[in-house]
Protein backbone atom coordinates (compact mmCIF):
# COMPACT_ATOMS: atom_id res chain seq x y z
CA UNK A 1 0.00 0.00 0.00
CA UNK A 2 1.45 3.35 -1.04
CA UNK A 3 0.82 6.48 1.03
CA UNK A 4 0.97 10.05 -0.27
CA UNK A 5 0.37 13.45 1.28
CA UNK A 6 -2.08 14.28 -1.52
CA UNK A 7 -3.67 12.66 -4.54
CA UNK A 8 -5.47 14.59 -7.28
CA UNK A 9 -8.10 12.91 -9.45
CA UNK A 10 -10.05 14.60 -12.24
CA UNK A 11 -12.09 13.84 -15.35
CA UNK A 12 -13.25 10.39 -14.25
CA UNK A 13 -16.68 10.86 -15.89
CA UNK A 14 -18.61 8.32 -13.83
CA UNK A 15 -21.88 7.71 -15.64
CA UNK A 16 -20.31 7.17 -19.06
CA UNK A 17 -19.51 3.87 -20.78
CA UNK A 18 -15.91 4.98 -21.38
CA UNK A 19 -15.18 5.51 -17.69
CA UNK A 20 -12.43 3.22 -16.41
CA UNK A 21 -14.01 2.80 -12.97
CA UNK A 22 -12.46 -0.61 -12.29
CA UNK A 23 -8.95 0.79 -12.78
CA UNK A 24 -9.74 3.75 -10.56
CA UNK A 25 -11.15 1.47 -7.88
CA UNK A 26 -7.97 -0.63 -8.00
CA UNK A 27 -5.88 2.54 -7.67
CA UNK A 28 -7.95 3.74 -4.70
CA UNK A 29 -7.59 0.35 -3.00
CA UNK A 30 -3.79 0.42 -3.28
CA UNK A 31 -3.08 4.08 -2.58
CA UNK A 32 -3.80 6.12 0.54
CA UNK A 33 -3.38 9.83 1.10
CA UNK A 34 -3.84 12.45 3.77
CA UNK A 35 -5.87 14.51 1.28
CA UNK A 36 -7.77 13.39 -1.81
CA UNK A 37 -8.66 16.17 -4.23
CA UNK A 38 -11.50 15.47 -6.67
CA UNK A 39 -10.89 18.14 -9.29
CA UNK A 40 -13.97 18.20 -11.48
CA UNK A 41 -15.87 15.99 -13.86
CA UNK A 42 -15.89 13.09 -11.42
CA UNK A 43 -19.53 12.42 -12.32
CA UNK A 44 -20.70 13.23 -15.85
CA UNK A 45 -24.00 14.99 -15.26
CA UNK A 46 -24.25 15.92 -18.93
CA UNK A 47 -24.34 12.25 -19.93
CA UNK A 48 -26.64 11.24 -17.08
CA UNK A 49 -29.19 13.87 -18.17
CA UNK A 50 -29.45 12.08 -21.53
CA UNK A 51 -29.59 8.51 -20.26
CA UNK A 52 -28.82 6.67 -17.05
CA UNK A 53 -25.69 4.57 -17.19
CA UNK A 54 -24.49 3.59 -13.73
CA UNK A 55 -22.96 0.10 -13.42
CA UNK A 56 -21.90 -1.38 -10.10
CA UNK A 57 -18.26 -0.42 -10.69
CA UNK A 58 -19.24 3.28 -10.71
CA UNK A 59 -21.12 2.85 -7.46
CA UNK A 60 -18.11 1.01 -6.00
CA UNK A 61 -15.85 4.01 -6.74
CA UNK A 62 -18.24 6.40 -4.98
CA UNK A 63 -18.51 4.06 -1.99
CA UNK A 64 -14.70 3.71 -1.78
CA UNK A 65 -14.27 7.50 -1.74
CA UNK A 66 -16.94 7.84 0.96
CA UNK A 67 -15.19 5.13 3.05
CA UNK A 68 -11.86 6.92 2.72
CA UNK A 69 -13.49 10.14 3.94
CA UNK A 70 -15.09 8.33 6.91
CA UNK A 71 -11.73 6.79 7.84
CA UNK A 72 -9.96 10.13 8.02
CA UNK A 73 -8.81 11.06 4.52
CA UNK A 74 -9.62 14.71 3.87
CA UNK A 75 -11.66 14.60 0.64
CA UNK A 76 -12.07 17.90 -1.20
CA UNK A 77 -14.39 18.10 -4.22
CA UNK A 78 -13.92 20.99 -6.67
CA UNK A 79 -16.73 20.58 -9.24
CA UNK A 80 -16.08 20.95 -12.96
CA UNK A 81 -18.32 21.65 -15.93
CA UNK A 82 -19.67 18.10 -16.29
CA UNK A 83 -20.63 17.96 -12.60
CA UNK A 84 -21.52 21.64 -12.30
CA UNK A 85 -24.86 20.83 -10.63
CA UNK A 86 -22.80 20.02 -7.53
CA UNK A 87 -21.75 23.68 -7.39
CA UNK A 88 -25.11 24.47 -5.78
CA UNK A 89 -23.72 22.73 -2.68
CA UNK A 90 -20.50 24.76 -2.40
CA UNK A 91 -19.46 25.16 1.21
CA UNK A 92 -21.32 22.05 2.34
CA UNK A 93 -20.08 18.57 3.18
CA UNK A 94 -21.57 15.28 2.07
CA UNK A 95 -20.42 12.14 3.83
CA UNK A 96 -17.31 14.00 5.04
CA UNK A 97 -16.56 15.24 1.50
CA UNK A 98 -16.12 19.03 1.37
CA UNK A 99 -17.51 20.74 -1.74
CA UNK A 100 -15.57 23.93 -2.55
CA UNK A 101 -15.14 26.22 -5.57
CA UNK A 102 -11.34 26.05 -5.25
CA UNK A 103 -8.71 24.89 -2.79
CA UNK A 104 -5.16 25.66 -1.72
CA UNK A 105 -2.73 22.81 -1.11
CA UNK A 106 0.46 23.48 0.83
CA UNK A 107 3.36 21.29 -0.25
CA UNK A 108 5.82 19.72 2.17
CA UNK A 109 8.28 22.54 1.46
CA UNK A 110 5.67 25.24 2.07
CA UNK A 111 4.71 26.17 -1.49
CA UNK A 112 1.04 26.84 -2.10
CA UNK A 113 -0.79 25.27 -5.04
CA UNK A 114 -4.13 26.66 -6.24
CA UNK A 115 -6.59 23.94 -7.21
CA UNK A 116 -9.48 24.71 -9.54
CA UNK A 117 -11.15 23.17 -12.56
CA UNK A 118 -10.05 24.46 -15.96
CA UNK A 119 -13.54 25.13 -17.29
CA UNK A 120 -13.35 28.52 -15.55
CA UNK A 121 -10.84 29.56 -18.22
CA UNK A 122 -12.57 27.98 -21.21
CA UNK A 123 -14.38 30.71 -23.16
CA UNK A 124 -16.25 28.15 -25.23
CA UNK A 125 -17.66 26.54 -22.08
CA UNK A 126 -18.50 29.88 -20.47
CA UNK A 127 -20.66 30.97 -23.40
CA UNK A 128 -22.10 27.56 -24.29
CA UNK A 129 -24.43 27.55 -21.29
What positions do the PLM features span?
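Proteins with a high burden of low-complexity, intrinsically disordered sequence enriched in S/T/G/P/A and R
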Residues: 11, 46, 125-129
